[in-house]
Amino acid sequence: MGLREGIPGTVFRADYQPPDFSVSHVALEVSIFDGLTEVVATLSLERNGPEGAPLKLDGEQLDLQWIELDGQRLAESGFELTANQLVIPNLPDRCVVRTCVQICPEENTSLEGFYRSQSAYCTQCEAEGFRKITYYPDRPDVLAIYTVTLEADRQTCPVLLSNGNLILEEEAAEGRHRATWHDPFPKPAHLFAMVAGDLKQVSDVFTTCSGKPVDLRIWVEEKDVNYCDYAMQSLKNAMLWDEQVYGLEYDLDLYNIVAVDDFNMGAMENKSLNVFNTSCVLAHPDITTDAGFQRVEGVVAHEYFHNYSGNRVTCRDWFQLTLKEGFTVFRDSEFSADINSRGVKRVEDVIFLRTHQFAEDAGPMAHPVRPDAFVDISNFYTLTVYEKGAEVVRMLHTLLGHKQFIEGASLYFRRFDGQAVTCDDFVDCMAEASGRDLAQFRRWYAQAGTPEVIANGHYDQAAEQYHLTLKQLNRPTPGQTDKAPLPIPVATGLLVDGKPIPLDSGTTRILELSEPEQTFTFDGVLARPVASLLRGFSAPVRLTIDQSESDLLTLMSGDDDDFVAWDAAQSLLARAIEALDLTGQESKIHSALREAIERVLVGPMDAAM
């Protein structure tokens, strides 16, 4: 029995069915008053499912005022209303449904849907918050074009924002005003956003690769306007990087970021209207550490990169969450590596993965990066889905090489633009672009747990050959007792006389461990080498190898791979601490370690390392 089988309310990936109705256009009229907000939603619907299937709209904590079908008010006998759903039977294949609800954002303490923060009204709709704003098929595979009109008191809410481009501003009665926004790109409900409040803007302009100017605005409380410059520069850097690396140009005329103190997630990638917690936007040398600057840079870039990997191409269902999050974490990690020190960034990511995600994989809640079942999707915004998901994408990048990986990503964005798709669709594009069979690779999406790779090397001096035997162990995890071998890219180098020797690609050869045990042979090795394994941490695995202190010293001071050199230093330092703890005095390893550190300091290694 699977981990969640038999639990009431469990949703299974295998049970996925397309929606019975699609929504081509959503028109929202939102009138904000103190203590009450009225939302009129107009949905243009078309039947996808079987004839006679009723329309089922999700809704929670909504006070329904009325319903119209094609302009005619429905009597209570014409629909069924429950605590979390509105069901309308006997609909024509094409129709327009209009609803009016009242909500109270001031009393919404869940911080999901539409709520009042200290400084503004704002939204959080991922994963299932839109149903707290209006009745809607609140699922990621229903994509629609939105036109939103916000009305509020001008004095208390002078700023009215939503997705897309501002198309109309006008005065209303009794000191109120309206703003109408139109987003021409179809999106799921979880990417909807609206903000109303007394906010100040920090502005800049980015000129895209085609020469189009894009207005950039960061909206904050007045007290925070002097702390947005770094976030703005990070946004511009991310926009340029996405053009240069992926060929992706921003697609609207305006990009807004709103930062509030009491946002319940770090940040949210709503189309063209990101909402952030201030901790991920505000930075200044007087108040921010280096780590704080890096966090702002990484989170701003992550949310921007979602514009394509998550927004233009989105998830069919929430089981595919890693499709957008794993891919985008990989993208923001590569961005930070290019902007700063690649070695330092990789080491930081590995430390986090080993410390936190490996523990999740080893515990009772171990799950694949693409789960098969959930009770509450909010519980699957996990390190496995995000961080291990990014490592799965990185392995594709390693196996295919940068050029073919980018070709696969470009095919993915072209083929599925404006669609809600799956992890399999992503892998299909990588396979098609590279001409490789990636059938076995899909196991990474299905199997939980951290594989262990055991390495043993043998040098044949007479034949001038080095034989490296790799064995993989995939131990049982909850709900998965029998594991199949995974394709594990083990980036490998060899050091002879303290220096890396030429291999397939520079000083690295990618060994593809796809069986329980395999032996790889290196020819033309003139002396016993020291193996440099898992270069760049090429796979999210635990590596077991018997290495002498001499081998570790060689790797620490002579390897040209920053991760392996750092990892060797960690092992040596641990041994030195253990030796000092046992004897109470320095030993041979301590003097050797000092010499290795001196060689690193004067060597060619990245100074940031």
Predicted regions and their residues:
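Surface-exposed beta-strand/loop patches in extracellular or lumenal glycoproteins
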Residues: V40-L62, Y135-D138, A144-D153, D424, ...
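Long, ordered, helix-rich scaffold segments
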Residues: R354-T355, T382, D523-M609
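Short, hydrophobic/aromatic-enriched beta-strand segments in well-ordered soluble domains
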Residues: V40-L45, G59, L91-N108, Y146-R154, ...
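Beta-strand-rich binding/interaction modules
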Residues: D63-D70, F192, D437-Q440, T450-L533
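Extended, low-hydrophobicity, Ser/Thr/Pro/Gly-biased non-transmembrane segments
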Residues: C100-S203, Y227-Y230, F441, D561-W566
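N-terminal, polar/Ser/Thr-rich
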Residues: M1-E38, Y115-Q124, R131, Y136, ...
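A surface-exposed beta-strand-loop module
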Residues: S31, N48-P50, P54-L55, G59-S117, ...
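Hydrophobic alpha-helical and helix-loop surface patches within well-folded domains
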Residues: W181, C209-A462, L468
